Amino acid sequence: MVKVGINGFGCIGRLVTRAAFDSGKVQVVAINDPFIDLDYMVYMFKYDSTHGRFKGTVKAENGKLIINDQVITVFQERDPSSIKWGDAGAVYVVESTGVFTTTEKASLHLKGGAKRVVISAPSADAPMFVVGVNHEKYENSLKVVSNASCTTNCLAPLAKVINDNFGIVEGLMTTVHAFTATQKTVDGPSGKLWRDGRGAGQNIIPASTGAAKAVGKVIPELNGKITGMAFRVPTPNVSVVDLTCRLQKPAKYDDIKAAIKTASEGPMKGILGYTQDQVVSTDFNGDTHSSIFDADAGIALNENFVKLVSWYDNECGYSNRVVDLVCHMASKE
């Protein structure tokens, strides 16, 4: 089983750790966070306002974090090059601080003995992979990769199915996105993005997102054909993508539903979900799919112009894909 170190024990770091234990696919052997001491790690991992209490056991013992009787080495280094990943047995590092997102910065982990790094965020220059979409293009020569964003992980599987079956001429995406840690609880300063500084719990906030353009990086045929924006809304978790696109090949809405359902039961099983139920956002809290197509929420204006709706737990689904990407990379060693 591949041994993993987690850098940054924030929301995604903790949920990747949960996903590792829940799935049993990878073994977390080390965690680094200079801002969270060991006892606080125990508390933060045990209790989660969104996903509930961890169902296993968590404790601190002899300077180590023990989760389900598994011993995890804890570091508190600010400089990634100072973390002794090799000593702890970590071969792969999940870079989830949100700070070291370039190839150069993420590569600092390699100095401490790690073999490869997966950035749990979009990257300006690291190759981006979306499991179920382009993960097969991963090559063993790559040391640092990005798992893209939660929104790209929702949009890309849907866009791939539509493009493969009907062809996308052009598209606009809107994500109605739960608030995240980058936002303010009450109005405050926010650099050049003034709207982003408004109270997250009080407002629907129009915001930018690179998620749609990033789809062009993971599906080259769609490069320059899709762009999008976000509305940040006052909910703590679960977001939804609205993809409005013009199709090359005319298709009835039922044909589109059938193509997505087939993909969800076949090549994209576990990645792309499908529902015809009368669902709302909280119904997807804890869902491990990257994207769950809502068959009854979409509409077609005609056979070439459609609006498609797909849900995602922007924390849980994404964290599970980080684990899946690590597993896929390890299988190529």
Swiss-Prot record:
It is found in: Cytoplasm, Cytosol; Cytoplasm, Cytoskeleton; Nucleus. NAD(+) binds at residues 11-12, 33, 78, 120, 314. PANTHER family: GLYCERALDEHYDE 3-PHOSPHATE DEHYDROGENASE, GLYCERALDEHYDE-3-PHOSPHATE DEHYDROGENASE. NCBIfam families: GAPDH-I. Belongs to the glyceraldehyde-3-phosphate dehydrogenase family. D-glyceraldehyde 3-phosphate binds at residues 149-151, 180, 209-210, 232. This is Glyceraldehyde-3-phosphate dehydrogenase. The active site is at 150 (nucleophile). Has both glyceraldehyde-3-phosphate dehydrogenase and nitrosylase activities, thereby playing a role in glycolysis and nuclear functions, respectively. Glyceraldehyde-3-phosphate dehydrogenase is a key enzyme in glycolysis that catalyzes the first step of the pathway by converting D-glyceraldehyde 3-phosphate (G3P) into 3-phospho-D-glyceroyl phosphate. Participates in nuclear events including transcription, RNA transport, DNA replication and apoptosis. Pathway: Carbohydrate degradation; glycolysis; pyruvate from D-glyceraldehyde 3-phosphate: step 1/5. Keywords: Apoptosis, Cytoplasm, Cytoskeleton, Glycolysis, NAD, Nucleus, Oxidoreductase, S-nitrosylation, Transferase. Disulfide bonds: none annotated. The modification S-nitrosocysteine is found at residue 150. It comes from the Eukaryota. The record marks 177 as: Activates thiol group during catalysis. PROSITE patterns: GAPDH (PS00071). Homotetramer. It catalyses: D-glyceraldehyde 3-phosphate + phosphate + NAD(+) = (2R)-3-phospho-glyceroyl phosphate + NADH + H(+); S-nitroso-L-cysteinyl-[GAPDH] + L-cysteinyl-[protein] = L-cysteinyl-[GAPDH] + S-nitroso-L-cysteinyl-[protein]. GO terms for molecular function: glyceraldehyde-3-phosphate dehydrogenase (NAD+) (phosphorylating) activity; microtubule binding; NAD binding; NADP binding; peptidyl-cysteine S-nitrosylase activity. S-nitrosylation of Cys-150 leads to translocation to the nucleus. Its main location: cytoplasm. Its EC number is 1.2.1.12, 2.6.99.-. Pfam families: Gp_dh_C, Gp_dh_N. One of its GO terms (cellular component) is cytosol. It comes from Xenopus laevis (African clawed frog).
